[in-house]
């Protein structure tokens, strides 16, 4: 973690199943804060980022190759609730790739 990138963890997103998939597991007494997110879809799909079952943001990919970057590095873009996992939800079985940078504190 540094002044230009407060995130202390990152992971590759590689999801193709419709429905919820856990990105970051819940941690007892801690919150997940997302500092950067990049997504790319192989086809038309609606992607939701969720704090447990609560939708934080919805991205509508009308076609393959579109990509919404969220590159906010000094303040968290999303702050989850305590003891809650960060999930991704796909409206259909379409390959979605990307990267997420986050902290758990």
Predicted regions and their residues:
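Beta-strand-centric surfaces of beta-sandwich/beta-rich domains
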Residues: 1-105
């Amino acid at each position: 973690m540094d002044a230009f990138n407060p995130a202390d963890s990152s992971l590759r997103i590689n999801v193709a199943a419709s429905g919820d998939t856990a990105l970051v597991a819940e941690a007892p007494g801690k919150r997940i804060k997302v500092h950067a997110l990049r997504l790319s879809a192989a086809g038309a799909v609606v992607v939701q980022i969720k704090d447990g079952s609560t939708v934080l943001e919805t991205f509508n990919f009308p076609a393959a190759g579109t990509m919404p970057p969220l590159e906010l590095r000094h303040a968290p873009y999303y702050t989850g609730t305590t003891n809650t996992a960060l999930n991704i939800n796909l409206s259909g079985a379409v390959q979605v790739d990307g990267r997420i940078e986050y902290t758990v504190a």
